[in-house]
Amino acid sequence: MLASISPFGERARASRWWLTTTAYVLSSALGGTLVGLLSALLGAAVPERWRWSPAGVGLAAALLVLGLLLDARVGGSRLPSWRRQVDEAWIGRYRGWVVGAGFGAQLGVGVVTIVTSSTTYAVLVLAALGGTPWVGALLGLVFGLVRALPLVGMVGVHDREALWAVLRRVELGAPAAEVVARVGLLAGASALAWTALGGVA
């Protein structure tokens, strides 16, 4: 998808890249906000004294650790996920802004397409643990915006050479991004475990 929606590709389809990308970013942010809000509302259905009990916080920490193990495919395990991705047949069939809005919303929600990292599930777990609608919405908003960043990075891609250069940079940066995600999950799991154990107490 990243290779398909670029100034170079959109120009060939007589579409405006900035409009497609704006629709993509806004709908990804909205999708993330909605799923974060929904997770927080579901979490709020559980009494706070249970959510923030040592058992509740410990369960959240365990889920983050489980996500790390699944990401690493320990014992041949795999992260549970849908087997579907956004429908690239939309490109060329619909107007650019429709494609941008449709793709952005699906990727912003995160769990309706292929889930490649447990960080997606971690956002839902943390939003539910908080149980506060505005915090959940904010977590989801940040998630949706971060998901949209790679497409924004296509700005300035006006020929094949520039497109391949960006794709090479993305490929080269993927291992570092994976490490950052795993460190973040580990830090979050450690903080939750510390809280569940009562800190220094």
Language-model segment annotations:
Residues 189-201:
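Juxtamembrane boundary at the C-terminal end of a transmembrane helix
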Residues 38-56, 126-127, 149-181, 194-195:
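Transmembrane-helix boundary and interhelical-loop signature of multi-pass inner-membrane proteins
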Residues 1-34:
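Juxtamembrane transmembrane-helix termini in multi-pass membrane transport proteins
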Residues 5-14, 18, 120-135:
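Interfacial segments of multi-pass membrane proteins
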Residues 49-60, 64-112, 159-177:
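Alpha-helical multi-pass membrane helix bundles of inner-membrane/thylakoid proteins
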Residues 131-152:
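Short alpha-helical packing/oligomerization segments
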Residues 1-4, 111-123:
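Transmembrane helix boundary and interhelical junction motifs in multipass membrane proteins
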